Regions:
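Glyoxalase I/VOC metalloenzyme domain signal
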Residues: 1-38, 48-98, 110-122
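Short, charged amphipathic alpha-helical segments flanked by flexible coils
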Residues: 45
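Short acidic/glycine-enriched loop/turn segments that link adjacent beta-strands
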Residues: 40-42, 101-105
Length: 122
């Protein structure tokens, strides 16, 4: 598939509100194999050194989330199988919420603050 060369904007970060930005940043840095790249007055950012994209965790006083996400990440293991990666993510503090249906199964997990994400097959 061919994609156009011209783009209107470039996505540089995904911002996630958190009651504990440091906790979520550490979880996601470990889950993705990234590192903390900035700790500012507004929160904590993770990414890859000089990478084009970051995830920013911003502290908000709203308390724990109470509804399903309208946006979630799908992640795919690179260096291990799906079950081994599931075990690793659970050990980091994720919890299993559901299992995907059909022939392309995936696991629905939640991070330490309850934000859902999917673990796909490699």
């Amino acid at each position: 598939m061919c994609y156009p060369v011209h783009v209107e904007n470039r996505v540089v970060s995904l911002v996630i509100d958190a009651t504990n930005a440091e906790l979520l940043a550490r979880f996601w840095a470990a889950a993705l194999g990234w590192q903390i790249v900035d700790r500012g007055g507004y929160g904590v950012s993770i990414g890859i050194d000089d990478g084009p994209f970051e995830i920013d965790f911003r502290s908000v006083p709203d308390g724990p989330k109470s509804v399903k996400n309208r946006l979630h990440l799908d992640i795919k293991p690179v260096s291990r199988d799906q079950v081994a990666e599931l075990d690793r993510l659970l050990a980091l503090g994720a919890r299993q919420v559901d299992v995907g249906q059909g022939s392309r199964s995936w696991y629905v997990l939640a991070d330490p603050e309850g934000n859902e994400f999917c673990l796909c097959r490699p």
